[in-house]
């Protein structure tokens, strides 16, 4: 009986130790508003902290060095190889679909979409034009070489090329542009560094599918149970409003997952 009790205790302790294993999350060192090691802030860092708490596991950030100016979707270098090699358990804010963001990485898989991100339209206070189709022949500031810039060309806007989200938003104050079309999370980071009172989100603007993406957690494909647990935690955090509050704290415009997202077909619909 004593040996049986000892065995049960050992099993219980082993189970407890396993449950307490840290949740390792790969985060880029300089990637505001998602993660910033120096300030200890960022939407992905806050999300990771909340998910780990829901799972009853301590959070272990795995910081990955990167350039300091990566703020656009097109420029992000997600540390997918580190995830595949087991350096961490999950990445957050990975855009779908997997055939694009995880191309050449069959050992990885995306979880459920838990929020959407898009190019957002900023204008001056009282602006009533609220769709891309109303921007033909209108001066619009946009960061060069982005999907947003291509979309503006399709609708016939007068493009005012900028080198950063902050510069695009600044062109409203200098009257070089009537609008700025900026990747939403990048706008949040730029406005946190340099507030632009002249740049306000355009009321009633709905991002077109061509300029919208859904964001997912990414795990190793074999970690099905972990992926399901993370999806469940993210659904609960969204239902409670915690994700929305974390996004707002970083200046990220909040969107529930979109029904339709970027594709070449959706881009053609802008014409």
For the regions a protein language model found, what residue spans apply to each?
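Bilobed "Venus flytrap"/periplasmic-binding protein-like clamshell domains
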Residues: 31-32, 38-58, 117-169, 184-186
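Bacterial N-terminal signal peptides
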Residues: 5-14
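Sec/Tat signal peptide C-region and signal peptidase I cleavage site
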Residues: 15-19
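Extracytoplasmic small-molecule ligand-binding "clamshell" domains
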Residues: 20-94
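A ligand-binding cleft/hinge motif common to bilobed small-molecule-binding domains
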Residues: 84, 92-104, 178-211
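Extended ligand-binding regions for polar small-molecule ligands
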Residues: 42-55, 125-126, 133-134, 138-139, ...
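Periplasmic-binding protein-like
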Residues: 28-31, 113-123, 192-235, 253-271
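Ligand-binding clefts/hinges and TM-proximal coupling segments of bilobed small-molecule sensing domains
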Residues: 58, 150-160, 233-271
């Amino acid at each position: 009986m004593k040996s049986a009790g000892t065995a049960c205790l050992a099993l219980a302790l082993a189970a407890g130790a396993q449950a307490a294993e840290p949740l390792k999350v790969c985060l880029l060192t300089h990637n505001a508003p998602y993660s910033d090691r120096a300030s200890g802030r960022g939407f992905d860092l806050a999300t990771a902290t909340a998910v780990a708490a829901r799972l009853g596991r301590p959070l272990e950030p795995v910081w990955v060095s990167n350039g300091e100016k990566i703020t656009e979707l097109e420029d992000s270098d997600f540390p997918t190889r580190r995830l595949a090699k087991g350096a961490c358990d999950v990445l957050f804010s990975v855009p779908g679909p997997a055939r694009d963001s995880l191309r050449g990485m069959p050992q990885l898989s995306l979880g459920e979409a838990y929020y959407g991100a898009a190019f957002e339209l900023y204008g001056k206070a009282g602006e009533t034009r609220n769709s891309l189709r109303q921007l033909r022949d209108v001066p619009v500031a946009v960061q060069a070489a982005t999907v947003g810039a291509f979309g503006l060309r399709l609708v016939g806007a007068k493009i005012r090329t900028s080198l950063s989200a902050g510069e695009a938003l600044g062109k409203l104050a200098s009257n070089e542009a009537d609008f700025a079309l900026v990747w939403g999370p990048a706008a949040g980071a730029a406005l946190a560094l340099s507030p632009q009172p002249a740049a306000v989100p355009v009321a009633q603007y709905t991002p077109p599918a061509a300029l919208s993406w859904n964001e997912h957690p990414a795990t190793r494909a074999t970690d099905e149970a972990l992926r399901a647990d993370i999806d469940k935690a993210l659904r609960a955090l969204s239902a409670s409003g915690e994700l929305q509050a974390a996004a707002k704290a970083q200046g990220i415009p909040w969107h529930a997952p979109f029904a339709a997202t970027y594709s070449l077909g959706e881009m053609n619909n802008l014409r």
